[in-house]
């Protein structure tokens, strides 16, 4: 199995531009599984609830997830990507898992960092594991790594690969 990641600096608020960057990079990627950054569609560091509401989308029916599904189908790969999710009036810092067969799942970040608590609700999905055929994968997002139980829970549930979309903003982050 070939696993890759594409770490880049998403431009805040420029969803179409960020998705164009992702598509161009993944069109050249030779991988079965690709992991993209936390909030890669919207960019990071929201300053207001209005920004979050304007940039968040429903999952799986929103335009970002749908475009990623199209890319995954065309490239025959699984993609894990971060985006701001809106479920009714509640917003989450989420990561979608999509593949050649379409939408696989969504993880909502459990451990919010600093000002994320002003704009996002703590995740309610729990730590999940998905069988993508070549491996069983789990997802945790950025600050979740700070809590060892996140990775431990995924391992105990059978994750062979832990995908970790991140937008590390602290100077001591690995």
What are the functions of these language-model segments?
Residues 1-5:
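Extreme N-terminal starter segment of soluble prokaryotic enzymes
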Residues 6, 80-81, 163-167:
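Short beta-strands and strand-loop turn motifs
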Residues 7-25:
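N-terminal phosphate-binding loop and adjacent alpha-helix
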Residues 7-9, 39, 141, 167:
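Short glycine-/small-residue-rich Rossmann-like dinucleotide-binding loops
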Residues 7-9, 37, 45, 108:
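Residue-level recognition of beta-strand->loop/alpha-helix junctions
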Residues 15-19, 61, 143:
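A conditional alpha-helix N-cap/helix-loop micro-motif detector
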Residues 24-100, 169-174:
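Cys-nucleophile CN-hydrolase/nitrilase-fold catalytic domain and related Cys-dependent amidase chemistry
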Residues 57-60, 86-174:
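Active-site catalytic loop in hydrolytic enzyme cores
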């Amino acid at each position: 199995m070939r696993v890759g990641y594409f770490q880049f600096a998403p431009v805040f608020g420029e969803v179409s531009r960020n998705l164009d960057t992702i598509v161009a990079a993944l069109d050249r990627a030779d991988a079965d599984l690709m992991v993209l950054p936390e909030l890669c569609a919207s960019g990071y560091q929201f300053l207001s609830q209005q920004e979050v509401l304007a940039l968040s989308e429903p999952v799986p029916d929103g335009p970002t997830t749908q475009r990623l599904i199209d890319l995954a189908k065309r490239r025959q790969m699984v993609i894990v990507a971060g985006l701001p999710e809106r479920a009714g009036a509640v917003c989450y810092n989420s990561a979608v898992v999509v593949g050649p067969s379409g939408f696989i799942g969504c993880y909502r970040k459990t451990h919010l960092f600093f000002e994320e608590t002003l704009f996002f609700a703590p995740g309610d999905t729990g730590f999940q594991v998905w069988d993508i055929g070549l491996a069983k994968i789990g997802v945790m997002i950025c600050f979740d790594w700070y809590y060892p139980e996140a990775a431990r829970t995924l391992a105990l549930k059978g994750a062979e690969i832990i995908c970790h979309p991140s937008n590390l903003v602290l100077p001591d982050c690995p």
